[in-house]
Curated annotation (Swiss-Prot):
Gene3D superfamilies: Transcriptional coactivator/pterin dehydratase. It comes from Shewanella sp. (strain MR-7). Its EC number is 4.2.1.96. GO terms for biological process: tetrahydrobiopterin biosynthetic process. SUPFAM superfamilies: PCD-like (SSF55248). The keyword Transcription does not apply. It is an enzyme of class 4 (lyase). Belongs to the pterin-4-alpha-carbinolamine dehydratase family. It catalyses: (4aS,6R)-4a-hydroxy-L-erythro-5,6,7,8-tetrahydrobiopterin = (6R)-L-erythro-6,7-dihydrobiopterin + H2O. This is Putative pterin-4-alpha-carbinolamine dehydratase. Keywords: Lyase. It comes from the Bacteria.
Length: 112
């Protein structure tokens, strides 16, 4: 499979398919620092990034906001002193789409 960071998000409509269990197992291996959470019956990807202070956490949040706008796919973001919690899921399908894995990989790339 092509590296997730090289892929672009595709438009995700309400009738788009969620990832299958087999796809989930394959894709999650490509983003090993991410976990799967279920909230209100909706599967989501989540990762907590640690930083030395609030300023660095906020700078990361701003870079992530720019990426989200470029890809037109937006995460849940909780910015706190020394950490940023990022949650990806596709609102229109109430679950996980390949776009979420692409964006998780691209989020990790922001640390480079």
């Amino acid at each position: 499979m092509t590296a997730l960071t090289q892929m672009k998000c595709e438009a995700c409509q309400a009738d788009a398919p969620k990832v299958t269990d087999a796809e989930l197992a394959e894709l999650i291996r490509m983003i090993p620092d991410w976990g799967v959470q279920v909230r209100d019956g909706i599967m989501q990807l989540e990762r907590v990034y640690k930083f030395k202070n609030f300023k660095l956490a906020m700078a990361f949040t701003n870079k992530l906001a720019e990426l989200a706008e470029e890809e037109f796919h937006h995460p849940g973001i909780l910015t706190e002193w020394g950490k940023v919690t990022v949650t990806w899921w596709s609102h229109s399908i109430k679950g996980l789409h390949k776009n979420d894995f692409i964006m998780a990989a691209k989020t990790d790339q922001l640390l480079d």
